[in-house]
Curated annotation (Swiss-Prot):
Induction entry: By superoxide.
UniProt keyword annotation of Hydrolase present: yes
Family: Belongs to the isochorismatase family.
Origin: domain of life: Bacteria
Record's catalysed reaction(s): isochorismate + H2O = (2S,3S)-2,3-dihydroxy-2,3-dihydrobenzoate + pyruvate
Protein name: Isochorismatase
Classification lineage: Bacteria, Bacillati, Bacillota, Bacilli, Bacillales
InterPro entries membership: ACP-like_sf, Isochorismatase, Isochorismatase-like_dom, Isochorismatase-like_hydrls, Isochorismatase-like_sf, PP-bd_ACP
GO MF assignments: isochorismatase activity
Pfam families documented for this protein: Isochorismatase (PF00857), PP-binding (PF00550)
EC code: 3.3.2.1
Gene: dhbB
Domain spans labelled Carrier: 229-302
Length: 312
């Protein structure tokens, strides 16, 4: 049940892209770049020097360079070698034992080798969210957009896009920065993503949108060290200040009304967050009075977050 050799096929072009149901726009302040399973074990199934793998690695490289320049976090997934049968579980039934314990198969391809600032997640299931802290990291950083690249398009990349959708994260599925067992499966992944859970886009178009983001948005992203102002940590600090408590004593899941956050204090937060570009209401906050829920709401409602000394 080893991965079969993949015959070359032409990487889809802009004319091959499906019609999207949504018109999402990438925001450097809200995005994370995912480089999915670009390990030697998986990449070696393609014919070296032929399409689609040549375009695949080149386009991911271009996207990564741009994301680093704009302060967008870069996340890799990589499956471990010699997995314990209990950890691998049902994957064995479909794909056999997987990678061996040798360093070559586990390694990310040289052209896309992770750098010191990149996050590498150990991958256990199709979805990059399953049994990893990707979702926790994105929420902590106040990011709700995921740029998906890598292999294989109709398996891990697509399942990750579906789970992102179910977590209210906008997935940008890059049509010529993913690859698959065949053009048919590649196109199937694009069609499903565009119609059900993601925004499909070509590399050059995505690069243009990121590059042409408003200058103040780009500056915010680069200057905040890959952070967004609407993080759980920052929200906790604001609440602690209003309650005159220590931030560490307030948890992300506790009911803030029970904690003593009254209507006057909530309206103070509403007014402050509106000034920062998040269109939220008192009723919305009162209905879901936890830091975790407020962080998700603020992230989805923020149009353009500008630096504010109150958060520093």
């Amino acid at each position: 049940m080893a991965i079969p050799a993949i015959q070359p096929y032409q990487m889809p072009t802009a004319s091959d892209m499906p019609q999207n149901k949504v018109s999402w726009v990438p925001d450097p302040n809200r995005a994370v770049l995912l480089i999915h399973d670009m390990q030697n074990y998986f990449v070696d199934a393609f014919t070296a020097g032929a399409s689609p793998v040549t375009e695949l690695s080149a386009n991911i490289r271009k996207l990564k360079n741009q994301c680093v320049q704009l302060g967008i976090p870069v996340v890799y997934t990589a499956q471990p070698g010699s997995q314990n049968p209990d950890d691998r579980a049902l994957l064995t039934d479909f794909w056999g034992p997987g990678l061996n314990s040798g360093p070559y198969e586990e390694k990310i391809i040289t052209e896309l080798a992770p750098e010191d600032d990149d996050l590498v997640l150990t991958k256990w299931r199709y979805s990059a969210f399953k049994r990893t802290n990707l979702l926790e990291m994105m929420r902590k950083e106040g990011r709700d957009q995921l740029i998906i690249t890598g292999i294989y398009a109709h398996i891990g990349c697509l399942v990750t896009a579906c789970e992102a959708f179910m977590e209210d994260i906008k997935a940008f599925f890059v049509g010529d920065a993913v690859a698959d067992f065949s053009l048919e499966k590649h196109q199937m992944a694009l069609e499903y993503a565009a119609g059900r859970c993601a925004f499909t886009v070509m590399t050059d178009s995505l690069l243009d949108q990121l590059q042409n983001a408003p200058a103040d948005v780009q500056k915010t992203s680069a200057n905040t060290g890959k952070k967004n102002v609407f993080t759980c940590e920052n929200i906790r600090k604001q609440i602690a200040e209003l309650l005159q408590e220590t931030p560490e004593d307030i948890t992300d899941q506790e009911d803030l009304l029970d904690r003593g956050l009254d209507s006057v204090r909530i309206m103070t937060l509403v007014e402050q967050w509106r000034r920062e570009g998040a269109e939220v209401t008192f009723v919305e906050l009162a209905e879901r009075p936890t830091i975790e829920e407020w962080q998700k709401l603020l992230t989805t409602r923020s149009q353009q977050v500008l630096p504010n000394a109150d958060y520093l």
